[in-house]
Amino acid sequence: MPNPKVFFDMTIGGQSAGRIVMELYADVTPRTAENFRALCTGEKGVGRSGKPLHYKGSSFHRVIPSFMCQGGDFTAGNGTGGESIYGAKFADENFVKKHTGPGILSMANAGPGTNGSQFFICTEKTEWLDGKHVVFGQVIEGLNVVKDIEKVGSGSGRTSKPVVIANCGQPS
């Protein structure tokens, strides 16, 4: 079975910025890939937090140029929240895939076994994250959109304009 693909339709400062299409490594990290896929479709309904288990309408709250763009906190919106389809947090599945360059999709965490819904897209090779963050996919279309998101980031991670996932799901 081919690996699933998902998309984000992005806005930057309220303006359409284009589509990011990602392939999820369900063959290597099935639990992590399924969590992200279901959070893109919103098919699991409402989570324990009382918020929909859905990336739609959530923001990239932390964008650091020449490093990464982080999002997926749909409960608090500031990097303190998020929730997986399995409950609050889940274990690191494996560290088979590496942070090899731009477009790598990886789980943000607060230490071992703390995966929820927050993720990041690398804009450079970030090999120091290997063995600490679970790589579970890659951008296959729209890396230019990721680069545009990177342009509104800062050293602190604060964005100069809101970066929002206006819509998301699986391409038909």
Curated annotation (Swiss-Prot):
Q: Respond yes or no to whether keyword Isomerase is given for this record.
A: yes
List the catalytic activities from the record: [protein]-peptidylproline (omega=180) = [protein]-peptidylproline (omega=0)
BP GO annotations:
protein folding
- Gene Ontology CC annotation, any one: cytoplasm
Alphabetized, the UniProt keywords read: Chaperone, Cytoplasm, Isomerase, Rotamase
Enzyme class name? isomerase
* EC number(s) from the headed UniProt entry: 5.2.1.8
Annotated compartments: Cytoplasm
Question: Which GO molecular function annotations are given, in alphabetical order?
Answer: cyclosporin A binding; peptidyl-prolyl cis-trans isomerase activity
Give a Pfam family name: Pro_isomerase
What does the record say about induction? Answer: Not induced by infection with virulent or avirulent P.syringae. Not induced by phenylmethylsulfonyl fluoride (PMSF) and yeast elicitator (YE).
Tell me if Isomerase is a UniProt keyword of this record: yes
Give the family, as the similarity comment puts it: Belongs to the cyclophilin-type PPIase family.
The protein's job, in short, is:
PPIases accelerate the folding of proteins. It catalyzes the cis-trans isomerization of proline imidic peptide bonds in oligopeptides.
Q: What is this protein called?
A: Peptidyl-prolyl cis-trans isomerase 1
Organism, per UniProt? Glycine max
